[in-house]
Structures are given as C-alpha cells and as structure tokens.
Amino acid sequence: MRPVFYHRHAVRYLRRMPADRKAQVKAAVGGIAALEDPLSHANVKALGGEWSGCLRLRVGRYRAIFHLLMDEGDECLEVLQIGPRGDVY
C-alpha cells in the first residue's frame, strides 16, 4: 500500500466536510492507494488540460484530484484537491 499525503487545500476542505462524508472519501482514497494500478478502478479517470498528469477519484458528488509521486524511491499518492464536482476543477 502506498502512503497517502494530503495537500493543505485538501485538508482544509476535509475539515469542513460532514463526518460521514469525510470518512467515505478517506476510505475511498485509501482503497485507491492499495491498488497496484489506480486507473483499474471504475471511479478513477486520468485528467487533461490544466490537470494533466493527475487522476480524479469520484466519491458520490465529491471529487478528489490526486497524483502519484516518487518519494525516496517509493511511490506515494498525494491528494491535491477535494470538493464538489462543480468547484474542484
């Protein structure tokens, strides 16, 4: 399983979310981190344009934008943004 890091923007939004939704998003991100290939998950899609190189995870009406990083030889998952569909892009 890859370690998961949250950018300060994602942490700020997580603090304001209802507790049940926060747990749902964190569980979904943890599930993606455990996968060998995140794109094999049905709710993950590669993004283009401004977010080129990033992936999107759909969790109900929320979206989490993340990318994979190499950290001292190990791959980790960094969550950049979390929010409702209309605001996160």
Spans of features found by a protein language model:
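Enriched for short, Lys/Arg-rich terminal
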Residues: 1, 8, 15-16, 23, ...
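N-terminal alpha-helical segment
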Residues: 6-7, 40
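Short strand-loop junctions, especially beta-strand C-caps/beta-turns
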Residues: 9-11, 50
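Alpha-helix boundary/capping and short turn/kink residues
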Residues: 19-22, 37
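A short, surface-exposed loop/turn module that caps and links secondary-structure elements
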Residues: 31-56
